[in-house]
Design a protein with these regions (language model features):
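Glycine-rich phosphate/adenosyl-contacting loop at the front of the ribokinase-like
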Residues: 1-60, 67-69
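Conserved N-terminal subdomain of the carbohydrate kinase-like
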Residues: 26-27, 35, 50-114
Length: 114
């Protein structure tokens, strides 16, 4: 497989699991929390790399700690970071994910950021 250039988003997934999804106004005690890389562009880049491609990702990040996580994960996954763009005003994107641990149903709020 040849060189692949992926244009797309990078967001930091902030995922929590609980016994059920909260209804408006309800607070639910969660059972677990995970933070990790996500976003359509990043996920496509990972898949292309696993299929044997030489992958670079074009995405925009904020100048924040989540950008460092993005850079580290891209390098760890063997993807080039030479095409990363940075915003001085906007933060790196985030996805707030709440997962029902019994049914696997979820609710997601995306803050696109940079």
């Amino acid at each position: 497989m040849g060189k692949i250039l992926v244009f797309g988003s990078f967001v930091v997934d902030l995922a929590s699991r609980g016994s059920h999804l909260p209804v408006p106004g309800e607070t639910v005690i969660g059972s677990s929390f995970q933070m990790g890389p996500g976003g359509k562009g990043f996920n496509q880049g990972i898949a292309a790399g696993m299929a044997g491609g030489d992958v670079a990702v074009v995405t925009k990040l904020g100048r924040d700690s989540f950008a460092k996580l993005a850079e580290d994960q891209l390098k760890k996954s063997g993807m080039s970071t030479e095409h990363l763009l940075y915003s001085e005003q906007d933060p790196t994107g985030t996805a707030l994910i709440v997962i029902d641990e019994n049914s696997a149903q979820n609710c997601i709020m995306i803050v696109p950021g940079a």
